[in-house]
Curated annotation (Swiss-Prot):
One of its GO terms (biological process) is virion attachment to host cell. HAMAP family: PPV_L1. InterPro entries: Capsid_L1_Papillomavir, Capsid_L1_sf_Papillomavir, dsDNA_vir_gr_I_capsid. It is found in: Virion; Host nucleus. This is Major capsid protein L1. GO terms for molecular function: structural molecule activity. Self-assembles into homopentamers. The capsid has an icosahedral symmetry and consists of 72 capsomers, with each capsomer being a pentamer of L1. Interacts with the minor capsid protein L2; this interaction is necessary for viral genome encapsidation. Interacts with protein E2; this interaction enhances E2-dependent replication and transcription activation. Keywords: Capsid protein, Disulfide bond, Host nucleus, Host-virus interaction, Late protein, T=7 icosahedral capsid protein, Viral attachment to host cell, Viral penetration into host cytoplasm, Virion, Virus endocytosis by host, Virus entry into host cell. Forms an icosahedral capsid with a T=7 symmetry and a 50 nm diameter. The capsid is composed of 72 pentamers linked to each other by disulfide bonds and associated with L2 proteins. Binds to heparan sulfate proteoglycans on cell surface of basal layer keratinocytes to provide initial virion attachment. This binding mediates a conformational change in the virus capsid that facilitates efficient infection. The virion enters the host cell via endocytosis. During virus trafficking, L1 protein dissociates from the viral DNA and the genomic DNA is released to the host nucleus. Its main location: virion. Belongs to the papillomaviridae L1 protein family. GO terms for cellular component: host cell nucleus; T=7 icosahedral viral capsid.
Amino acid sequence: MALWRPGDGKVYLPPTPVSKVISTDRYVQRTNLFYYGGSSRLLTVGHPYCSLQLDGLQGKKNTIPKVSGYQYRVFRVQLPDPNKFALPDGTLYNPDTERMVWACRGIEVGRGQPLGVGTSGHPLYNRLDDTENTTLLVAESSDSRDNVSVDYKQTQLLIVGCKPPIGEHWTKGTACANPAPRPTDCPPLEFTNTTIQDGDMVETGYGAIDFAALQENKSEVPLDICTTICKYPDYLQMAAEPYGDCMFFCLRREQMFARHFFNRQGVMGEALPDSYYLKGANDKAAPGSYIYSPTPSGSMVSSDSQLFNKPYWLQRAQGHNNGICWFNELFVTVVDTTRSTNLTICTATSPPVSEYKATSFREYLRHTEEFDLQFIFQLCKIHLTPEIMAYLHNMNKALLDDWNFGVVPPPSTSLEDTYRFLQSRAITCQKGAAAPPPKEDRYAKLSFWTVDLRDKFSTDLDQFPLGRKFLLQAGPRSVSVSRKRAAPSSTPTSSPATKRKKRKQ
């Protein structure tokens, strides 16, 4: 006898359909027009450790900025609006249904100045013992800080995208109220994502943390980072970004080794468990400081391992955005610690000086940097169908407004009042139409190095170094010259002699 029984397996329903992120190659049509854009020589000079204010003087003109070889340089490259270009072909696109955008195809970041190693340090560095050389243990005292200098981790970095890069670091978190923490307890740590701005310090080998919030003695690290935040690029976050705007591609090279090994002086906040050691006599009854910390070193710099002063061509980006510069902007993030030489400058207190005396001279410190940015851009167009416009609006609502695509209000059918004398005391105050609000800069509260290329585009690629390299890799520029002798131009008047055929007998 056959009986029906319900199935024991679970019923799986299909997932709810969601909108997919598509590549820009699906809706961006590339043209055969290429443009070169390049900056002038970009220079910056300042103090490598801190920003200084001249005595008794105020204002930016009397401020010496902080310029270090261990800072991020984030260039905000402003491009011209291609929809306002005088194009050589007027039929290239339809302004009613299409919009033009730029695609980055090539970039070269030029770096001037010689290779060099820059050092940093602290005149009151928290070091107790040289834990590598055990014979050099110092006597316990209330203050064993010493003047120590280091050369940081060596880093070369290049990130290109149409949005600023995302950084990560650890900072002081919020502890739970129950139980209430004591003021001397180790604070909880919180992982934080922030935008990397121009002038932020790179991770130098001491960790990506907020030193101002987590190191209150200001002696754990060198001077240039003891009151600031060291950020590390969040490659995982930028690689997982849905639209791929923060990082079209990146190049990085890091190297470091530990030069010295110290331990920290202070009261151990967390005592070692007794099971970890056997107590001794006299000064060995209790262990000393076990907070060990090395000093980093970036080792040798060489021109054989340089990421800069060479071109890079973008054929396929790692994300869905294949080099399209939304809002006509491009962000280039550069770190190069292989040119971090600090210049020492000396002036005499009362010239002329005939005999050396240390108090007769004043010592100063400066750091200089030199950059040159070159780009190859390709002109592209987007056919704005309803589906594409809905997708772009979902990606960024301000993009269509930037292209002057807005909602047109319906015409008013009500009867409006219009006075003859608008400036009259006999009638109520007439308020004019409200002025449209100015466009807000999305990055007004952030600091970047602005590079304006809106009037520096050219189609003559062969007149610029990067343009010639682009033409060379795109194909040969001229036909090879033949070494064969040319045939005579004139034709003989007489006909050539013909061979007489032999007849068979």
